């Protein structure tokens, strides 16, 4: 693909040049080619976007629920019509295999938008009788202008996960995509405008987190920030949001999630789940089950089943429909993952497979890392304690149920957890003791629109998807009505 034209900001229904004068490049990680130069939003651009959003939000909130629902459903239709085009762009920007982006990223994002479009008419208040002459009624009103700050691993899906409930509740959103993968969020803005969204209701400001992101979190005109990213960045977002105007926040942060295989589990099923929990999207999924706990007596058999499945991984041309494994999203991220792999070797973990970059024709110019499995891991190892966000699985053994529960919970994270067992009594008993917000029994990874997702502990605050997320983009107004004559004590 030839280099794209310079990408601008999207404010008030159209593209506009940034006033900051700063630009950055977005790179195809499969081959190192520059895809485009992108303009970065500065403080004046954030001010412009907020003013635009304030204007658009008033128009949007004044529409009827059915009018808003129809516009968002029209956007869903356009997303599905343009699925292949958007998936190709997502593959170029992220490096993910087209077999994945064409069936997951836009598809699931559109599902979430459709879900919230259908919920808009159901967003209602309540009536509370006090006595014969008085009652209270409540209204759910939009917050106003909110900000979404996305991560680089699921660019358009995250933009939809954040914008769908916000817009459904009558808000306007200013969205900052990751500077690593900014392209499809701009296309989403085009689609919203084409669907009939009023100008300003969805503005997109590319730029770095330390500049554009900070300006958004500090801006007094923004009522809420929804952030997806790392824990350290999330803490800064929370601090800025609180210091500026006590903004509400939703935080979807990191994870180091446990996948527990019990001794009664079908080991073929468990190995299939472990593969998906570690190597889907080349391991760049926040919910990955990277700490795989296996009964000591099953270790050797499980290792062989994992090795057999690693042989089925097909890395290569990301547009080949048979390819199911792509490069990492960027060269700096590749180097960081390689540092973790080196640390694992240094601390005594045994490399079962992988452990290096992929080499050879088609790989040398890209950010490729081989699918890596470490065994003989211990809980104190760096690769077991810290989020790597790459194709690195750690196998650990255990002896008892109580032991594995304790060790699974021994982490600052609490995003996800999984169990593989034939005993559903055990599954529920153990799951109720695991400290994680997104949990799976005999499966892994699905996050449907109806399912609230979010973490415990350092993995986040608040939830995305589900009814409660729609409500989190509203504020409740309570109104008392008195029909009898008011009696003053004065």
UniProtKB/Swiss-Prot annotation:
GO BP: glycine betaine biosynthetic process from choline
Binding site for K(+) 1: 26-27, 93, 180
The name this protein goes by in its record: Betaine aldehyde dehydrogenase
GO MF annotation list: betaine-aldehyde dehydrogenase (NAD+) activity; metal ion binding
UniProt remark on cofactor binding: Binds 2 potassium ions per subunit.
Function according to Swiss-Prot or TrEMBL: Involved in the biosynthesis of the osmoprotectant glycine betaine. Catalyzes the irreversible oxidation of betaine aldehyde to the corresponding acid.
Lineage: Bacteria, Pseudomonadati, Pseudomonadota, Gammaproteobacteria, Enterobacterales
Assembly notes: Dimer of dimers.
Key word NAD present: yes
Catalytic machinery residues: 162 (charge relay system), 252 (proton acceptor), 286 (nucleophile), 464 (charge relay system)
Family: Belongs to the aldehyde dehydrogenase family.
Keywords tagged on the record: Metal-binding, NAD, NADP, Oxidation, Oxidoreductase, Potassium
Coiled-coil spans in chain: none
Sites of Cysteine sulfenic acid (-SOH) modification: 286
Listed CDD domains: ALDH_F9_TMBADH
EC number: 1.2.1.8
